[in-house]
Amino acid sequence: NIKQHNLKKTLKEIILQDYKQVKILEKIIHPFVRKEMKKFSINNQRKKMVFYEIPLLIESNLMKHFDIIIFIKAKKKIRLNRFLDKGGEKKMFNLLNKRQFSDIKKAKFSDHIVVNEKNLNILKKNLSGIISKYV
């Protein structure tokens, strides 16, 4: 969608020019995200399991909304390369990375930790092992 692409591009430009704008953007975006999260939960309440992928879950103090937290981690260099492969810029990666807690701190709030430094098949296998404990 061209409109979404242009919005993302504009937001990136704002963030790169003045990182302090992130706080303002978060105050606008986070209530909407939480509303969508709640709607998703309601629409899926009959399912045995529901999965969310939430950047900055712990940093945003959203842990209380979930029964199980799986922390998927990778070395900074690997995360940077993946970000660049998706068309991201190193400066943006560094700005976003600063917002994250350390792996040690995130691990304290996690029920499971999965290292994601290989390929998607290995990640899926590791996640399947965890999920099978709850089915």
What is each model feature region?
Residues Q21-I24, E53, I68, L95:
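Residue-level recognition of specific faces of alpha-helices
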Residues L25, F51, V114:
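Residue-level signature of catalytic and energy-coupling elements of molecular machines
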Residues E26-K27, I72-K73, N116:
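Active-site-adjacent beta-strand anchor residues
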Residues N1-R46:
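ATP-dependent small-molecule kinase phosphotransfer cores
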Residues K12-E13, E26, L80, L84, ...:
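Amphipathic alpha-helical segments within well-ordered protein domains
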Residues E36-N43, M49-D85:
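ATP-dependent NMP and nucleoside kinases share a basic, alpha-helical "lid"
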Residues V33-M37, K64-H65, K76, K86-V135:
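Small-molecule kinase domains that catalyze NTP-dependent phosphoryl transfer to phosphate-bearing small molecules
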